Amino acid sequence: MPTVQTPSQRRANTQFQKNITRRVKTNSKERYVAKHPPTKIPRNIAMFFILLMSGGIILGILRFLLTFFS
């Protein structure tokens, strides 16, 4: 036998469902990405290390060439 809700219970239930829906909408990933765009710091750090290592390789080649042709 189904339970009959009182009007105050029905209102509370409706309000609860509205709050749940609102919370789900505000916690969505799209909204989070819109508020907090991904940073470029990891990419910048990676580029720095790539440039640093390629500079070291170029210096090593130059040093080898200088010792080879001297």
From Swiss-Prot:
Biased composition (Polar residues): 1-19
Pfam families: RAMP4
Transmembrane segments: 45-65
Membrane topology, as annotated: Single-pass membrane protein
Localisation: Membrane; Endoplasmic reticulum membrane
GO biological process, any: response to unfolded protein
Record's GO cellular component terms: endoplasmic reticulum; endoplasmic reticulum membrane
Disordered as annotated region, ranges: 1-20
Keywords: Endoplasmic reticulum, Membrane, Transmembrane, Transmembrane helix, Unfolded protein response
Regulation: induction: Differentially expressed during meiosis.
Superkingdom: Eukaryota
Record-stated family: Belongs to the RAMP4 family.
Function as written in the Swiss-Prot or TrEMBL entry: Interacts with target proteins during their translocation into the lumen of the endoplasmic reticulum. Protects unfolded target proteins against degradation during ER stress. May facilitate glycosylation of target proteins after termination of ER stress.
Protein name: Protein tam14
Gene source species: Schizosaccharomyces pombe (strain 972 / ATCC 24843)
